[in-house]
């Protein structure tokens, strides 16, 4: 009987301890850009190992989905690969840059051109140029692999290229016959499977595209590397930002943001093929 009482006491103590731990555990839910998934996945893996009382999660559904989720209290932090809109700032969104990225253009293996001008690139994206022959390639229709409109990459290309080259709103629109996919990985996969195709991805995915046998284009005779991006020779580049709302910030949120911008966090950014803010 005495042994049974001791066993019950030990089980009760264990359950009480576990419940207390669960009550004390802070959940930091993050949502946003698919581009930064490799960075966030590795950061979270390392952070969760050294912070027993905090569990960080990442839901890569796109920059706009992440920011909307922040305002709707689904996420405590959003990660965006596009700039905040005026409306988002007015709603209380606050940004912190934690990395830099460039958008690079990849083509299927049979496209042998190595360089393209910004103007011709923009004309491919809006449909003014329809055949590879018009830019020195084979006589074949151009198949364009595009991102969905909630993607930060989609918005960034529109701002950095289409709006830069074209003067009217009508011209600065993506062509309607693009094949729409939801992530950088899907762009690489679709481009590898679709003859005579072109798509765009983040710099951190360059190695993956090369492994698939795809070509990376120089733009205005400049190949995208960390050096040409840092020196502003390659100009199709953007900030990767942490988005918070002052109304919902707490200590667990600020601690993870501090980790992201720390030397350890920045090493992870570089390891994943992107550019750190302290580069």
Curated annotation (Swiss-Prot):
<dbReference type="InterPro" id="IPR050811">
    <property type="entry name" value="Phosphate_ABC_transporter"/>
</dbReference>
<feature type="binding site">
    <location>
        <position position="63"/>
    </location>
    <ligand>
        <name>phosphate</name>
    </ligand>
</feature>
<feature type="signal peptide">
    <location>
        <begin position="1"/>
        <end position="18"/>
    </location>
</feature>
<feature type="binding site">
    <location>
        <begin position="151"/>
        <end position="153"/>
    </location>
    <ligand>
        <name>phosphate</name>
    </ligand>
</feature>
<keyword id="KW-0592">Phosphate transport</keyword>
<keyword id="KW-0813">Transport</keyword>
<comment type="subunit">
    <text>Monomer (in vitro). The complex is composed of two ATP-binding proteins (PstB), two transmembrane proteins (PstC and PstA) and a solute-binding protein (PstS).</text>
</comment>
<feature type="binding site">
    <location>
        <begin position="33"/>
        <end position="35"/>
    </location>
    <ligand>
        <name>phosphate</name>
    </ligand>
</feature>
<dbReference type="GO" id="GO:0005315">
    <property type="term" value="F:phosphate transmembrane transporter activity"/>
</dbReference>
<comment type="function">
    <text>Binds inorganic phosphate with a Kd of 1.2 uM. Part of the ABC transporter complex PstSACB involved in phosphate import.</text>
</comment>
<comment type="similarity">
    <text>Belongs to the PstS family.</text>
</comment>
<dbReference type="GO" id="GO:0043190">
    <property type="term" value="C:ATP-binding cassette (ABC) transporter complex"/>
</dbReference>
<keyword id="KW-1003">Cell membrane</keyword>
<dbReference type="GO" id="GO:0006817">
    <property type="term" value="P:phosphate ion transport"/>
</dbReference>
<keyword id="KW-0732">Signal</keyword>
<keyword id="KW-0564">Palmitate</keyword>
<feature type="lipid moiety-binding region" description="S-diacylglycerol cysteine">
    <location>
        <position position="19"/>
    </location>
</feature>
<protein>
    <recommendedName>
        <fullName>Phosphate-binding protein PstS</fullName>
    </recommendedName>
</protein>
<keyword id="KW-0472">Membrane</keyword>
<feature type="lipid moiety-binding region" description="N-palmitoyl cysteine">
    <location>
        <position position="19"/>
    </location>
</feature>
<keyword id="KW-0449">Lipoprotein</keyword>
<dbReference type="InterPro" id="IPR024370">
    <property type="entry name" value="PBP_domain"/>
</dbReference>
<dbReference type="Pfam" id="PF12849">
    <property type="entry name" value="PBP_like_2"/>
</dbReference>
């Amino acid at each position: 009987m005495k042994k049974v009482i001791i066993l019950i006491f030990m089980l009760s103590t264990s359950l009480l301890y576990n419940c207390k731990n669960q009550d004390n555990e802070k959940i930091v839910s993050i949502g946003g850009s698919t581009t930064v998934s490799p960075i966030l996945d590795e950061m979270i893996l390392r952070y969760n190992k050294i912070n027993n009382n905090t569990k960080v999660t990442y839901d890569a559904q796109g920059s706009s989905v992440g920011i909307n989720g922040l305002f709707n209290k689904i996420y405590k932090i959003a990660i965006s690969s596009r700039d905040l809109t005026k409306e988002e700032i007015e709603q209380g969104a606050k940004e912190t840059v934690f990395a830099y990225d460039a958008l690079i253009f990849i083509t299927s293996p049979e496209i042998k051109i190595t360089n393209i001008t910004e103007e011709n690139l923009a004309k491919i994206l809006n449909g003014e140029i329809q055949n590879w022959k018009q830019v020195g390639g084979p006589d074949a229709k151009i198949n364009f692999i595009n991102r969905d409109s909630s993607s930060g990459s989609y918005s960034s290309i529109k701002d950095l290229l289409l709006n830069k080259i074209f003067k009217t709103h009508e011209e600065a629109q993506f062509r309607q016959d693009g094949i729409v996919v939801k992530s950088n990985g899907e762009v690489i996969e679709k481009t590898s499977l679709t003859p005579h195709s072109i798509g765009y991805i983040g710099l951190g995915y360059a190695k993956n595209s090369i492994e698939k046998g795809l070509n990376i284009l120089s733009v205005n005779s400049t190949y995208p590397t960390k050096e040409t991006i840092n020196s502003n020779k390659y100009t199709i580049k953007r900030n990767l930002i942490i988005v918070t709302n002052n109304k919902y910030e707490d200590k667990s949120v600020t601690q993870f943001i501090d980790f992201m911008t720390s030397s350890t966090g920045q090493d992870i950014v570089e390891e994943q093929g992107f550019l750190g803010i302290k580069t």
